[in-house]
Amino acid sequence: MRIYLRTFGLCIVVALLSLVFLFSKHDEGSFSAGFKQVRAPLQQKSFNGAKAKQRPTATTSHRDVVQNPNSPVQEEVLMHLAAVACGERHGEVVNMLKTAVTLSQRALRFHIFAEQQLQTSIKADLDSWPAFIQGKFSYVLHPISFPHEHHEEWSQLFKPCASQRLFLPMILRELDSLLYVDTDVLFLQPVELIWDMLMLFNSTQLIAMAPEHEEPRIAWYSRFSWHPYYGKMGINSGVMLMNLTRMRITQFKNDMTPVGLHWDELLMPLLQKYKLNITWGDQDLINIIFHYNPEMVYTLPCHWNYRPDHCIYGSNCAPAEDEGVFVLHGNRGVFHSDKQPAFRAVYEAFEQYTFGEDLRQSLLSRLEVALNETTHTYCGKASHFFTTGLQKSVRRLQRATPPGD
């Protein structure tokens, strides 16, 4: 009788352990593991035939549209640049990509996350660029994609689609490194200069970002935030250079669990804890994460993410004064309003530039004339910082281009 009872008890224990295992796997798949691995082949591909283990749990299947199928460029030399476009961001994202491909000499692959209605127009613009420009880049169009269970919450955090960038390490699983920028960004220096900063990371660093402010008297986080933030004045998420491999495997310290959590395990609990205390959405979550993990951040100088706050109350970005602006970030819509005409002048100069025209005459000289009309504003008085960086880029390109090409 005892033998039967022991056997019965053992069966019960095995059954309970099996149930626990099954539920744990279900919970794991419902949030992070279900993100589909997005490949970036050099030819158009459908994911309908993907294996079951790669099945996406996001609301929309991923679709690749990659240009230049016969490009000889090797995968390992590509610089990967990502952006997220929703709403009225079509013009911005195309202009941002235009600045990147105009000033860079290395091959680029663009990863563009966009709503379905924007994908067609973005594709049409990129496909219309001349062949000598298309030979410098390839691109992948991705749909906006969030975990099923919390899609609505993530998609409406701060601005529509803004929090998509939080999920890039899980979606772009085949990539080792990535440069993410907001759509309202213009490159005034080649992408390779910031991309090469990956080699400057030490053994603990996995992301490079610029401070939110340089001047404590106008800093948001140190004066108004109701949550932890990185460093003395926080960091800005408009430009992020990421080692995705490290981000996927690292366990992040936090104030919720005694042990570290992986990136994909951390995001939802963090939002649930702080959603009533955050103002700037996903940027605030990033600040909270790196408040507890400051050793993981490589600090970019402010001229790699130059915003109106760096000049609107007087110049407060010393690297820009010394070397010029390298990346211009027109946040708060200043590229499309009259609030900061100097920022708008740079945006319109690139927008009106035609590929193949002389950069000095058709871009730089016209921009200098337009900026001279903005000197009645604080940022207009500092607008020579904008052209200093661009002049360096133009000279570099002209030296690299043989006469007659």
Swiss-Prot record:
Keywords: Glycoprotein, Glycosyltransferase, Membrane, Signal-anchor, Transferase, Transmembrane, Transmembrane helix. Glycans are attached at N202, N243, N277, N372. SUPFAM superfamilies: Nucleotide-diphospho-sugar transferases (SSF53448). Gene3D superfamilies: Spore Coat Polysaccharide Biosynthesis Protein SpsA, Chain A (3.90.550.10). Residues 1-2 are cytoplasmic. GO terms for cellular component: membrane. Belongs to the glycosyltransferase 8 family. This is Glucoside xylosyltransferase 1.
